Amino acid sequence: MTNNTMLISLSTQPADARWGEKATLSVNEQGFTIHVGTTSLNGKAALATIQRAARKIDGQGIKHVKLAGEGWDLANSWAFWQGYRGPKGQRTVEWADLSDADKKELNDRLKIVDWVRDTINLPAEDLGPEQLATRAVDLLCDVACDAISYRITKGEDLREQNYAGLHTVGRGSERQPVLLALDYNPTGNADAPVFACLVGKGITFDTGGYSLKPSSSMDSMKSDMGGAATLTGALALAASRGLQQRVKLYLCCADNMVSGNAFRLGDIIRYRNGKTVEVMNTDAEGRLVLADGLIDASEQNPQWIIDCATLTGAAKMALGNDYHALFSFDDELVAALQESAKEENEPFWRLPLEEFHRSHLPSSFADLNNIASGANTAGASTAAAFLSHFVKNYQQGWLHIDCSATYRKSAVEQWATGATGLGVRTLANLLLSNAK
């Protein structure tokens, strides 16, 4: 420990009255004490208090701390890091002693969840569709290279292989659209059944296309690949925790730009599964690229298909940035995810998805419209319903996550500005606890 290191300790006792009646942080000669405000150093309330206190400590410009005293188990240590970490500058934490298993888990989270946060925070100039795909491959090879094989398809090859949605959305950019199809197969058996397919939206920048976003909505659109990054991290963390089932990952990566070659309103996309889609809003592009990945996933006949995307503003309007929205016709799968979310202390909330939502996308010229009719305003539900048309067995084993909690445009009590990494641990837990 250096002279510049601040000690951080935990206490169930209230702060001295001079710090204020509801103070959760006090200072002495050695450093800071976090007062969790409960009789236990564990539990959801304590974790939230620790994370908020860590955010305050970082706000003081303190860049080197040591977690000292009792109570610094894995959960509390991770809560501290979640709040302490910021998008710029270096921070050093001297961790308390943990068991070998907990130390490995902490190090895996630091590598993988921080990779997710760093990747989402990258400016679009530094992260195009192909870079996103190769970064995902690099992470997964670093974790479990012997179990990984992959294929990258890009540009005109997408059109020739009938990935119509991804090619249509991405063709307006100088940076080619890319589909990453990655196979995690730790069994060593090339004929092993696929347990799960993960399909991620990887829009590395979203202008809205000709349905152009205003600057106030476009300024955070480097984060529109948050679903792809989250699923990559989830598979990597599950692999690091010992996942022995075969999982395939599909990342649908593109820019959504305005150019002479960009797609237009009224265009009709013809998908490999026979569906035709009329484009009536080029800013509803995420569902168009995900459709290609979902068709591929369905062809694998997996037990589960899970897609993750920063898909709609409607989900964010309903839940803010505090929860990921989840949609499914499969109650058992929803219950399994909610149990995993509870175990990992991550926020998910189910929103409605019913059979009637599937009929809210009428078109006079195609099978589907890429946005709901004006009379049907449940934007997040109809977006999920659109995706269901590209899942072969959509009523069982399919889960859609509209990941509203991936990114924050400004700092709040518990989070710095930028990516949060929320959802990675829950999805890793789900893959592990339900793989048979």
Swiss-Prot record:
The terms describing its cellular component in GO are:
cytoplasm
**Which biological process annotations from GO are given for this protein?**
proteolysis
Keyword Transmembrane helix on entry: no
Enzyme Commission code(s) on record: 3.4.11.23
By its UniProt entry, which Pfam families does this protein fall under? Answer: DUF3663 (PF12404), Peptidase_M17 (PF00883)
Enumerate the residues binding Mn(2+) 1: D206, D283, E285
Q: How does it assemble?
A: Homohexamer.
Under what name is this protein listed?
A: Peptidase B
Q: Kindly list the organism's lineage.
A: Bacteria, Pseudomonadati, Pseudomonadota, Gammaproteobacteria, Enterobacterales
Corresponding gene?
A: pepB
